[in-house]
């Protein structure tokens, strides 16, 4: 009878020994499709909280946590009243995408330097790959708050040839 030895580097510094027959019996057991792990070896418990009570990034338990947010509910506008979006927006930031001719966007980005106090960051010109308009580019502008974004849109002159897309981005 063969004996298998391994070391669990993460949780223990001691060796666990399991016989080959015990190992085969445990591996032959077919777990249910909803089982997340199959344990082989000695039973150990670790001080982990269940997924149902583990807090999400915004302090809610996973069962209470927000699902996908529907942008049609008004969260994409500064006057939106989607409370779920605001509650779970710990790592989201207000943004706008400026969409238009690549060269025009490049020139616009350089002109926006003088308004740097009205935004947080601005990306270089980028584009989606795949089927689409190869001459269209996008600039992403991020803000510290919705108020700053509103002030930017009211202050800065954006050319009519550039489309403005307002939204949020998870950082």
Swiss-Prot record:
The stretch of residues making up the signal peptide is none
The domain of life is: Viruses
Q: Which GO terms describe its molecular function?
A: DNA binding; DNA-binding transcription factor activity
Oxidoreductase among keywords: no
- Protein location: Host nucleus
Q: Does the keyword Methyltransferase apply?
A: no
Q: Which UniProt keywords apply?
A: Host nucleus
- Tell me one GO biological process term: regulation of DNA replication
Q: Pfam families from the entry? A: PPV_E2_C
Q: Which SUPFAM superfamilies match?
A: Viral DNA-binding domain (SSF54957)
**GO CC annotation terms, alphabetical:** host cell nucleus
Q: Which Gene3D superfamilies match?
A: 3.30.70.330
In UniProt terms, what function does this protein have?
Plays a role in limiting the replication of viral DNA in keratinocytes. Recruits the host NCoR/SMRT complex to viral replication foci to mediate repression of both viral replication and transcription.
Instruction: Please state which protein family the record places this protein in.
Output: Belongs to the papillomaviridae E8^E2C protein family.
Any idea what this protein is called? Protein E8^E2C
- Species whose genome carries this gene: Human papillomavirus type 18
